[in-house]
Amino acid sequence: MSSGVHWKLHWETELASSDHEELASFFRNTYGPTGKFNAKPFEDGRSWAGARPELRAIAYDSKGIAGHLGLLRRFIRVGETEVLVAELGLYGVRPDLEKLGIAHSIRAMAPVVDDLGVPFAFGTVRYAMRNHIERFCRDGAANIVSGIRVESTLADVYRDCPATRTEDVLVVVVPVGRTMSDWPSGSLIQRRGPEL
């Protein structure tokens, strides 16, 4: 990101209502251009779409919030193996700063992820983001794992809809306390909750 941007880590309990309102506006403006439905969860000052993060890396510049990455520790099931991960999600960069940031947000979060004692950081992205993520993975700090379906619960329950969904997405794995060879094999990841 540009030199005028600085990152700050916030535990969820440190954020005030005004922070959530500012983040909600950021997400509506960032996700809205990708489809009205994508901005809907952020109405009424809500700053999360599915699971609520416990830690956030937030980038600021002279215009306000410039970028965001959320983190939530959780167990997921990969094939037949339970794995503790730091799920990374709710990634966004203000449209005027696009193409300048995912590596910076991960690096801002890295020292805390190390302290959390998790073996892996994990996230999912749409296939449309593949080129963007591949650039981030070039130095080997993260790995794209394709051909895996991911099952999640829906953030809200509706009488006429299933309670879960299974998606074919790109899985991004960042080894933290282990090596990539320790990541279990399997064609299905069960999140056991809503995505971050």
Curated annotation (Swiss-Prot):
Alphabetical list of Pfam families matching this protein: NodA
Q: Read off the lineage from the record.
A: Bacteria, Pseudomonadati, Pseudomonadota, Alphaproteobacteria, Hyphomicrobiales
Work out whether the entry's keyword set contains Cytoplasm: yes
Physiological role? N-acyltransferase required for nodulation. Acts in the production of a small, heat-stable compound (Nod) that stimulates mitosis in various plant protoplasts.
Q: Which family does it belong to?
A: Belongs to the NodA family.
Gene3D superfamilies, per the entry: 3.40.630.30
Its protein name is: Nodulation protein A
Q: Which GO terms describe its cellular component?
A: cytosol
Key words, A-Z: Acyltransferase, Cytoplasm, Nodulation, Transferase
Tell me its EC number(s), please. 2.3.1.-
Location relative to the cell: Cytoplasm
> A single GO molecular function, which one?
acyltransferase activity
- Principal localisation: cytoplasm
